[in-house]
């Protein structure tokens, strides 16, 4: 292929000049730059400036580059290793192992990270529920197999812990393959997750791809595509159902904003890139169910300043089948996972998909919680005594439901000292139906905290009564 030379370096942006009589590289083509120390830097063509000069974005640090260095046009986009050999391994955006394990040789199967979304006639039109073992999710915002789910929340409300628990439950409960993509998050968290997953035994069913906070914006913008490409191989070639975790999709948008500014584009609303909707669509449209297999994507979405009207989370909303909203007020009450049962939604919450009994229990739980929410102002001003008997009953049951929506997580057991609970969907429906019917009105409220099925609450109430009797 043709060779060029560096004419300008501005941070992570490298301008490369090619001879005008040679064929210029296409947009998204990978270029290799051999530094003086022998290492190779990969950049990706982003813009044509004219007169044979291409503006490229570096996938690693640009230290050691100088004007005049030769640049090789690879003639293809970045490609990454795929297949069973990726399971249990950790990669960077280029598909290079970063876990100290064996390198992938030239014969390893690879796929380009830039690919078209599946065609309409390849899509699977059926809707199937994915059981997660987490009560609040399975009951009130059921996840669709092959769907896209957003975990919304500000800093420190538990998005990453919830993702870890979902990986744990899907690997243990469904023996499913997962691809975890760390986009622009803390390196410490990525390291902790690697060792936790290795210790719990789920790593052997998971491929991990990291482009963390310390990486250049080009790597953070493309690492989501690297993880998606690995997942697409298992779906399209192996015919498997795959879970794709992206933590954090906001950082994908943020990196795109940085790259857009470096390329000299005029910013759009709130300083975001004008191509925000296009970039998000190109990623999200590849995440879907086909007739061969499915990719179910669970994406943590950081909400800047807890503002859901910010263009980044608002653009993500349009692509989602279900949303799990994490609420800081619930963490202050000690309710984990801090999922807001009224703000979280799912397109699958319909009787023709989940069944009439599940639908009736879920909507009644929401009605009771909504009524409790409406009565809270009266309670705070006038007290419980001013409520009617019926309203007092609703409040008491709503508080039990609110506490019962909490659940101990396996991945958080070292912090909480409690063993994690996986609750089957039928047990979840049965338990909440019993609370709504008033079967457990005599149990103390605190017995419902951090339980699995309702039998745990009954046992906890018995222990509390025994402790009081012994005192």
From Swiss-Prot:
Its main location: membrane. It catalyses: ATP + H2O + 4 H(+)(in) = ADP + phosphate + 5 H(+)(out). ATP binds at residues 153-160. It is a peripheral membrane protein. InterPro entries: AAA+_ATPase (IPR003593), ATP-synt_VA_C (IPR055190), ATP_synth_F1_bsu (IPR005722), ATPase_a/bsu_AS (IPR020003), ATPase_alpha/beta_chains (IPR050053), ATPase_F1/V1/A1_a/bsu_N (IPR004100), ATPase_F1/V1/A1_a/bsu_N_sf (IPR036121), ATPase_F1/V1/A1_a/bsu_nucl-bd (IPR000194). Coiled coil: none annotated. PANTHER family: ATP SYNTHASE, ATP SYNTHASE SUBUNIT BETA, MITOCHONDRIAL. Produces ATP from ADP in the presence of a proton gradient across the membrane. The catalytic sites are hosted primarily by the beta subunits. This is ATP synthase subunit beta. It comes from Levilactobacillus brevis (strain ATCC 367 / BCRC 12310 / CIP 105137 / JCM 1170 / LMG 11437 / NCIMB 947 / NCTC 947).
């Amino acid at each position: 292929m043709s060779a060029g030379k560096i004419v300008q370096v501005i941070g992570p942006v490298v301008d490369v000049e090619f001879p005008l009589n040679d064929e210029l590289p296409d947009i998204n083509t990978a270029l290799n730059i051999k530094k003086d120390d022998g290492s190779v830097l990969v950049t990706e063509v982003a813009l044509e400036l004219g007169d044979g000069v291409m503006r490229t974005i570096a996938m690693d640090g640009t230290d050691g580059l100088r004007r005049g260095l030769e640049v090789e046009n690879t003639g293809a986009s970045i490609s990454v290793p795929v297949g069973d050999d990726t399971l249990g391994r950790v990669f960077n955006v280029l598909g290079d192992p970063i876990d100290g394990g064996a390198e992938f040789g030239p014969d390893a199967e690879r796929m380009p990270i830039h690919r078209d979304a599946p065609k309409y006639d390849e899509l699977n039109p059926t809707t199937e529920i994915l059981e997660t073992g987490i009560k609040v999710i399975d009951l009130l915002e059921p996840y669709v197999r092959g769907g896209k789910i957003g975990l919304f929340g500000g800093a420190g409300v538990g998005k990453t812990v919830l993702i870890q628990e979902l990986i744990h439950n899907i690997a243990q409960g469904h023996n499913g393959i997962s691809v975890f993509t760390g986009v622009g998050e803390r390196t410490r968290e990525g390291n902790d997750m690697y060792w936790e997953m290795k210790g719990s035994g789920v790593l052997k069913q998971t491929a991990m791809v990291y482009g963390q906070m310390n990486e250049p914006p080009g790597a953070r913008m493309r690492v989501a595509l690297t993880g998606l490409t690995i997942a697409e191989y298992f779906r399209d070639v192996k015919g498997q159902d795959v879970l794709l975790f992206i933590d954090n999709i906001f950082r994908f948008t943020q990196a795109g904003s940085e790259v857009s500014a470096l390329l000299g584009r005029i910013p759009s609303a709130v300083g975001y890139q004008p191509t925000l909707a296009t970039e998000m669509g190109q990623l999200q449209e590849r995440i879907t169910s086909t007739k061969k297999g499915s990719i179910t994507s669970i994406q943590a979405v950081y909400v800047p300043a807890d503002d859901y009207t910010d263009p980044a989370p608002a653009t993500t909303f349009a692509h989602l089948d279900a949303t799990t909203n994490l609420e800081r007020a619930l963490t202050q009450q000690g309710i984990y996972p801090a999922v807001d049962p009224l703000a979280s939604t799912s397109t699958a919450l319909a009787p023709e998909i989940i069944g009439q009994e599940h639908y009736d229990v879920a909507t009644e739980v929401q009605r009771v919680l909504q009524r409790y929410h409406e009565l809270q102002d009266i309670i705070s001003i006038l007290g419980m005594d001013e409520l009617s008997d019926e309203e007092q009953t609703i409040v008491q049951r709503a508080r039990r439901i609110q506490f019962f929506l909490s659940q101990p997580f396996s991945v958080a057991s070292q912090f909480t000292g409690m063993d994690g609970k996986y609750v089957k969907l039928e047990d979840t429906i049965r338990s909440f139906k019993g609370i709504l019917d008033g079967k457990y009105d005599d149990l103390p409220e605190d017995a419902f905290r951090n339980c699995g099925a309702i039998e745990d609450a009954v046992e906890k109430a018995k222990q509390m009564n025994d402790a009081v009797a012994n005192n």
